[in-house]
Amino acid sequence: MGRLLVLEGIDGCGKTTQLQQLSSWLPKSGLMPDESRLVVTREPGGTALGTSLRQLLLHPPQDADPGPTAELLLYAADRAQHVDRVIQPALERGDWVLSDRFTGSTMAYQGYGRGLNRELITDLERIATRGLTPDMTVWLDIPLALSVQRRGSREEDRIEAEGLAFLERVSEGFSDMCKARDWVSVVADRPLLEVAEAIQTALLTRAAAWQR
């Protein structure tokens, strides 16, 4: 079996940039078996179906915004397809998968942010993932003010436009899960390369534990 690595965090935390850094470093790190490939993916939108769901979730037509429960179920559908068509087959081939978001984002945004029932979300996680859990999740932790500053004047999607109070609840959710789910926390309000090196060091440490 391969390995599933996940980057989590609020919008503007630098996930996309760090995903690119990690995807360049990993194949040369010596951590991956020679025969393994690296599959880089994201949620929502890691499959053809997921791409359509992403558009519906983040940029819906006028007057077609999904309600909170519908939103939760659409994210679960995206994840179920993602696990079934991309992640699980890759792991079974012995490949490594690097994903921009996974189950933690649903708990943070829909559980903490929207205030939906967290036990229900946990049950949906189990169904959508068929019990699959990441080998390592990295939470990129940044102050909310920096998140807002980094996003600047770019066009916001439907979730990003929810406002500061929503983002505060989401950030609290990520913090709680980092403690409860054995995630790795990386302070991300530093220069790009410092953050990348911190992630690499954390991964080397975790990989050493896998060998024990």
UniProtKB/Swiss-Prot annotation:
Its EC number is 2.7.4.9. It comes from Synechococcus sp. (strain CC9311). One of its GO terms (biological process) is dTDP biosynthetic process. The gene is tmk. GO terms for molecular function: ATP binding; dTMP kinase activity. Belongs to the thymidylate kinase family. ATP binds at residues 9-16. The keyword Cell division does not apply. This is Thymidylate kinase. Phosphorylation of dTMP to form dTDP in both de novo and salvage pathways of dTTP synthesis. PROSITE patterns: THYMIDYLATE_KINASE. Gene3D superfamilies: P-loop containing nucleotide triphosphate hydrolases.
